[in-house]
Amino acid sequence: MSEQRSPMSGDSHPLRRSTDRASLPGTRTVSLVLTVRPGDGRPGAALDRLLGQVPASVREVVLIGGPAEAGAARDGLRVVRLGDWDSTRGDIPHAALLAATGDLIVLMNADGSMSPHEIPHYLHYLESGYDFVKGSRFIAGGDYADYPLSRRVGHHALLRIARRLYGQHLTDLWYGFCAFRRPFVDLLDLRGDGVELGAELVTHALHYGLRVAEVPSLELPRRHDPSHPRTIRDGARILGALLHERPHNALSRLAHGPFRGPSG
């Protein structure tokens, strides 16, 4: 696990301070937001399997874009369906996050590439005082099922840019498996609903000075319709997200000297 803190103290909005009274483990309510994106084919069986794996600590699932015929969830699990994903709009994920009522919110894809069995690990770090916890496929204990060389090279380049813009050393920039406290949603102004969503969430967290932790995550093979990454287009969208949230002094830092820092 790695910890990151934003250097932008002037814009800090910490959601939890060291003087706050910590709640007992398990006393906060937890919502899981599941996204089924356009083009994900027929996710019904994979979604039913995923709902059956949701841990007991999660009491609410907000499902966006899922089929109406998705199977019943376990007893005690409330499922809220927001209907079809309109790809012409850029605020779909934000609407789903706003619909979640839990004190802690977990966001993950419903394509089978992310496992609900990892959710307690994310919640542990939130309960321990972190504001934003994100998964990483590139730290000890994490791994990925399919990551072409061109995509790894692009990710490495974007990490170096992010380190110069934000002064941090994250290892996985756009992986969308993350968890955070409910007040973070009120700080968001999400613009994208594609691959750059993960990067937008991370940059918002850094911008507001939240205490960020990375935890290892295992990316599994998608259970329906394998992904078709478009490296150049996706990279351009993520770069746009990084630049949009950059601190005011970031471009001057970017212009001074070669990139430095450990490989990502």
Give short role names for the model-derived ranges:
Residues 112-114:
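Acidic metal-phosphate-binding loop of nucleotide-sugar-dependent transferases
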Residues 66, 108-110:
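Active-site acidic Asp-centered loop
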Residues 50-81:
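Acidic donor-binding segment of Leloir-type glycosyltransferases
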